[in-house]
Regions:
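Acidic/glycine-rich C-terminal interaction modules and beta/coil loop segments
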Residues: 4-123
Length: 123
């Protein structure tokens, strides 16, 4: 896969640490597939993440009890109403179910990062 393409990180995210991560997920998921990579910005524990997230963002959640050998997994965040949001898993391997939360709980979900650019594998 050619990942040498220059990708511009939006100005609002330049204060955060960024990295490239690979995904391993189910083949039946149309949004993220095996061997896809993503540029992820990582949040600090002290960051208020609510203003950094938009409807239908893909986030990285740290949860050791997610049912996979890894502490982290990706999920879609969807703001359903002005006072609540939903976390939807993007892999059938993750044991955690889709859940809805109050907006006040957004900083306690353990969202540690956000996918800002998906790099599709055409292998």
């Amino acid at each position: 896969m050619n990942t040498n393409t220059l990708i511009e990180i939006p100005e609002r995210y330049k204060q955060f640490r960024a990295g490239i991560s690979k995904f391993a997920t189910s083949k039946d998921n149309k949004r993220i597939e095996n061997n896809d990579q993503a540029i992820i910005i990582y949040f600090d524990e002290t960051d208020n993440i609510e203003p950094l997230l938009f409807d239908k963002d893909i986030v990285v959640i740290n949860d050791e009890m997610n049912g996979t050998p890894f502490n982290q997994f990706v999920a879609e965040i969807n703001f359903i109403e002005s006072n609540s949001f939903e976390i939807k898993k993007l892999s059938k391997y993750v044991a955690i179910n889709n859940s809805s939360y109050s907006i006040e709980d957004i900083n306690s979900i353990n969202i540690i990062g956000k996918v800002i650019k998906l790099i599709r594998s055409f292998d």
